[in-house]
From Swiss-Prot:
Signal peptide: none annotated. N-glycosylated; contains biantennary glycans. It is found in: Secreted. Plasma. This is Alpha-1-antiproteinase 1. Belongs to the serpin family. It comes from Equus caballus.
Length: 53
């Protein structure tokens, strides 16, 4: 069977392919101010123990 007609043409790398990606403009995240004490506990159900307190 002749597969030469189905071959994908090779392309060379251009200058644009080697440049660094462009910077994506992003806004700063909202500022979070906590005025009261709080407790955060991360608990693992498999081991039945706190992972972070």
């Amino acid at each position: 069977e002749d597969l030469q007609g189905d071959a994908v043409p090779e392309t060379s790398a251009t200058k644009d392919d080697n440049e660094x990606p462009e910077m994506i403009p992003m806004s700063l995240p909202p500022e979070l101010e906590i005025n009261k004490p709080f407790i955060l506990i991360i608990y693992d159900d498999n081991t039945k123990s706190p992972l972070f307190v």
